[in-house]
From Swiss-Prot:
Organism annotation: Girardia tigrina (Planarian)
GO molecular function list: DNA-binding transcription factor activity, RNA polymerase II-specific; RNA polymerase II cis-regulatory region sequence-specific DNA binding
Name listed for the protein in its UniProt record: Homeobox protein DTH-2
Record keywords: Developmental protein, DNA-binding, Homeobox, Nucleus
Stretches with biased composition (Polar residues): 220-231
Subcellular location: Nucleus
Gene name tied to this protein: DTH-2
Keyword Cell division: no
């Protein structure tokens, strides 16, 4: 082939290009060969350049297995429309030799691989840009935190000029001061809510504990109450009432006064039933007159002057001593004498008769 001019340069070309150049140079049609038996006489002798659509080596099972194992073919799905265009162009080059098709597929696989690599690099760059755009956490110094907390205790909400002034003092931006105050207010509210919840839990716990203790001590209380009810004093209800918040001091004093009046009341019912005209002055006058008359002294002395007591003596009517009870002589005068106890009108008349008789001589 070296004797043919221009054929040496064709060795580096593809077989299809070399064949076309050779035909154009010799001016011979594809149906005959000018070189005799040394070269191929017809196109049909180029068996390697037969129609690739009928071969099962590329489109059959073996080809599908090779395609599944080839990483370049798996990346072709990322090409999208480019892969569809390449597949459509394959039908146009159906008469092209198999080596050309293999080169085209290799080029398509490399292109798809490069496109996928570019997409991954682009996604990584976007992620890096997003991470760079995210603001870093700012760490405050101890002096800045101290100044912020001191101002927060004085004022929980700051206006825009106040934030700007405070930010200039501690070398921060007004936005940083604003965010710090917002976070600190939220923390304070949350801590306050947690504290209230803990207090409620403690109260409920103590309440339940007291209820349980009362239930455990209730049998002992019933036994103690049953034993102490027999030895209870009148002052215990008052003490219990004081514990319940009631005041019975005035009521107790009134009861005490009534008891004292009842104790001071005389045992004899004479002063409660004598008429109004039998007063102290009248009784003193009658006593002075009765001392001069032995009959009045013996008969009426015990009723008019009950405080004077003496032992009765046996004998006639005149032998009754002063201060003798009228009950002892009630049967002598009238069966109703002891019932009326000197309140009967006949007894009042008889007493006046005896008093008038004191001035007359007695037979």
């Amino acid at each position: 082939m070296s004797g043919i001019p221009g054929l040496a340069g064709m060795s580096s070309m593809s077989p299809y290009s070399a064949y076309a150049a050779l035909t154009q140079h010799t001016g011979v049609s594809s149906g005959s060969s000018p070189f005799g038996s040394q070269y191929c006489s017809s196109v049909n002798d180029f068996n390697p350049y037969s129609d690739p659509r009928g071969s099962n080596t590329w489109y059959g099972m073996a080809a599908s297995a090779n395609a599944s194992n080839d990483p370049r073919m798996t990346m072709s799905r990322l090409m999208g429309s480019a892969a569809a265009a390449a597949s459509s162009s394959m039908s146009a080059y159906s008469g092209i030799p198999t080596n050309f098709h293999q080169g085209m597929h290799s080029a398509m696989g490399m292109a798809s691989l490069g496109a996928a690599t570019y997409d991954h690099q682009k996604a990584a760059m976007q992620f890096n840009n997003m991470s760079q755009r995210r603001k870093r956490r700012i760490l405050f110094s101890q002096a800045q935190i101290y100044e912020l907390e001191r101002r927060f205790k004085q004022q929980k909400y700051l206006s825009a000029p106040e934030r700007e002034h405070l930010a200039n003092l501690i070398n921060l931006t007004p936005t940083q001061v604003k965010i710090w105050f917002q976070n600190h207010r939220y923390k304070c509210k949350r801590s306050q809510k947690d504290k209230e919840k803990e207090q409620q839990k403690e109260k409920s716990y103590h309440l339940k504990k007291n209820i349980v203790d009362d239930k455990e001590r209730s049998p002992n209380k019933q036994i103690c109450n049953a034993s102490s009810s027999d030895r209870s004093t009148p002052e215990e209800p008052v003490a219990k009432a004081k514990e319940s918040g009631l005041d019975f001091s005035n009521h107790k004093i009134d009861n005490l006064n009534l008891k004292m009046e009842a104790d001071l009341e005389p045992k004899s019912s004479l002063y409660s039933i004598i008429p109004p005209y039998l007063t102290n002055s009248y009784a003193q006058q009658t006593q002075s007159e009765a001392q001069t008359s032995p009959i009045i002294n013996n008969v009426l002395g015990s009723n008019l002057f009950p405080e004077r007591k003496s032992t009765p003596t046996m004998g006639p009517l005149t032998s009754y001593s002063f201060g003798q009870s009228m009950d002892s002589i009630s049967s002598f005068y009238s069966p109703d004498f002891s019932l009326y106890n000197c309140a009967h009108p006949y007894m009042a008349a008889s007493s006046s008769y005896f008093m008038n008789a004191a001035s007359r001589p007695w037979n």
